[in-house]
Amino acid sequence: MPKMKTKKSAAKRFQVRGSGSIKRGQAFKRHILTKKTTKNKRQLRGSAAVHETNIASVKAMMPFA
């Protein structure tokens, strides 16, 4: 059986919290920011939690997290 490996792209994007929930960054805030309102950009700050329907697939990509 081959080695289990972590998907490095997922490891760079997600962090597992102590409670088991997974933290992710917000999308839509890297570029083309001039046409976005100040309110919209402010609301995109910080991080968010991965939805419960996606937690299993994210954990499968990071078997050691």
UniProtKB/Swiss-Prot annotation:
Gene Ontology biological process terms from the UniProt entry: translation
Region annotation Disordered: where it falls in the sequence: 1-26
Keyword Ribonucleoprotein: yes
Record keywords, A-Z: Ribonucleoprotein, Ribosomal protein
UniProt GO cellular component terms: cytosolic large ribosomal subunit
Superkingdom, natural source: Bacteria
Family statement drawn from the similarity comment of this UniProt entry: Belongs to the bacterial ribosomal protein bL35 family.
Designated name of the protein: Large ribosomal subunit protein bL35
Origin species: Bordetella avium (strain 197N)
